[in-house]
């Protein structure tokens, strides 16, 4: 049996302000730093240690991972970063308030943009300075692969090849793996691992900073999964994520 730990980054400054973030590089809030610290403590209390870590190219996930590894006394382990683990690109919604957007377009429309499988928001124009083609961290990636907007289906299409080529291979080699990423890149992976339907993924909410453990068989099929931490806090955190796209 293998174990895999997934962690969504702690609350970011834009999570706190209820803004669509996507590929915008936003720091952790004070609460997010505390969440990452608590995630590290819970992992340490439960005896977890790791051989390799994977993260995105975005600072909120990187900082969450660094805080967790410091808590574990494991800042020395290898960390591999990839744009393929970035948050889903929210296109022209990036920077907009979720509740205000729900007031304008309706809660149902915002829910579809946030949680549906195959409906992307309006795209960014390539001339927009927020477009990833203008970000130096992605200069080695073909422009055709950098998104102007994404639905979850698009996110799955970039996450799963990285899972297969890099992460799954590390697990099979016997390495203990932690992934620090984002709500939608982790939803993409969970959908694949659990073979979830397009409808069921709509209801999945992953809370910030709380370690999610997958126990996998020899073929990397899930045996079971569970969050580490206080059950009431976990439930409240999941409800908070679910309510982000509702009107004020």
Swiss-Prot record:
Listed GO MF terms: phosphoglycerate mutase activity
GO biological process terms held by the UniProt record: gluconeogenesis; glycolytic process
Pathway(s) where this gene product acts: Carbohydrate degradation; glycolysis; pyruvate from D-glyceraldehyde 3-phosphate: step 3/5
Keyword Cell membrane: no
Superkingdom in the source lineage: Bacteria
EC number, UniProt record: 5.4.2.11
Active site (catalytic residues): 9, 87
Sites annotated Transition state stabilizer: 182
Keyword field: Gluconeogenesis, Glycolysis, Isomerase
Reactions catalysed according to its record: (2R)-2-phosphoglycerate = (2R)-3-phosphoglycerate
Residues binding substrate, per UniProt: 8-15, 21-22, 60, 87-90, 98, 114-115, 183-184
Record Pfam families: His_Phos_1 (PF00300)
Family: Belongs to the phosphoglycerate mutase family. BPG-dependent PGAM subfamily.
Function statement: Catalyzes the interconversion of 2-phosphoglycerate and 3-phosphoglycerate.
Protein name as catalogued: 2,3-bisphosphoglycerate-dependent phosphoglycerate mutase
Annotated source species: Borrelia hermsii (strain HS1 / DAH)
């Amino acid at each position: 049996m293998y174990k895999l730990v997934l962690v969504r980054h702690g609350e970011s400054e834009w999570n706190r302000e209820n803004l669509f973030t996507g590929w915008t590089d936003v720091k952790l809030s004070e609460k997010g730093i505390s969440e990452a610290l608590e995630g590290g403590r819970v992992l340490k209390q439960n005896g977890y240690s790791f051989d390799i870590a994977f993260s995105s190219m975005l600072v909120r996930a990187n900082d969450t991972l660094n805080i967790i590894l410091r808590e574990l006394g494991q800042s020395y382990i290898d960390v591999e970063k990839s744009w393929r683990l970035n948050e889903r690109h929210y296109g022209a919604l990036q920077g907009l308030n979720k509740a205000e957007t729900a007031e304008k377009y309706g809660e149902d429309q915002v829910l579809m943009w946030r949680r549906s499988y195959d409906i992307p928001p309006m795209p960014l124009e390539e001339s927009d300075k927020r477009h990833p083609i203008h970000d130096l961290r992605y200069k080695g990636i073909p422009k055709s692969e950098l998104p102007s907007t994404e639905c979850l289906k698009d996110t799955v299409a970039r996450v799963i090849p990285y899972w297969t080529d890099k992460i799954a291979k590390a697990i099979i080699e016997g390495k203990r793996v932690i992934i620090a990423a984002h709500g939608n890149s982790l939803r993409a992976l969970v959908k694949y691992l659990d073979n979830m339907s397009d409808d069921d993924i709509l209801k999945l909410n992953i809370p910030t900073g709380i370690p999610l453990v997958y126990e996998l068989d020899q073929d990397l099929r899930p045996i079971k999964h569970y969050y580490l931490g206080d059950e009431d806090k976990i439930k409240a955190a999941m409800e908070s994520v679910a309510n982000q796209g509702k009107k004020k």
